[in-house]
A protein has these predicted regions:
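Short S/T/G/P-rich N-terminal loop/turn motif that feeds into the first structured element of a domain
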Residues: 1-47, 52-66, 80-101
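Short, conserved catalytic or adaptor-binding loops enriched in Gly and charged residues
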Residues: 75-79
């Protein structure tokens, strides 16, 4: 499996609008096992994105999907910048089917 955890900063006061866009059109991404958008509790403009994919290749391919491209274009003006980004190897857990159970 392939995992990503990243911090995104919204333009001041635009976090709700940005999170709404990031949640649009993300329900049909082949290979995506988990896609979670979370608000940072200590920074009113920060968002954490946690993704789990079956393969890195499917993650990369998802960036070319029309719905994802549309969301990126719509979100771009609301993004002030990016913070930490971590690549992980998810092993499993509650809500994540790994095929190993």
């Amino acid at each position: 499996m392939y995992g990503l955890i990243g911090k995104m900063m919204a333009v001041s006061g635009q976090r709700d609008a940005l999170t709404a866009i990031l949640l649009e059109g993300t329900s049909d991404m082949p290979g995506c096992l988990s896609y979670i958008i979370a608000e940072d509790t200590t920074d009113a403009n920060a968002i954490w994105i946690t993704e789990v994919w079956d393969t890195e290749a499917n993650h990369k391919a998802s960036l070319g999907l029309p719905a994802v491209q549309a969301a990126i274009a719509k979100a771009r003006p609301l993004i002030a910048g990016f913070g930490e980004r971590f690549i992980t190897t998810p092993l499993g857990g509650v809500g994540l089917l790994t095929g190993k159970q």
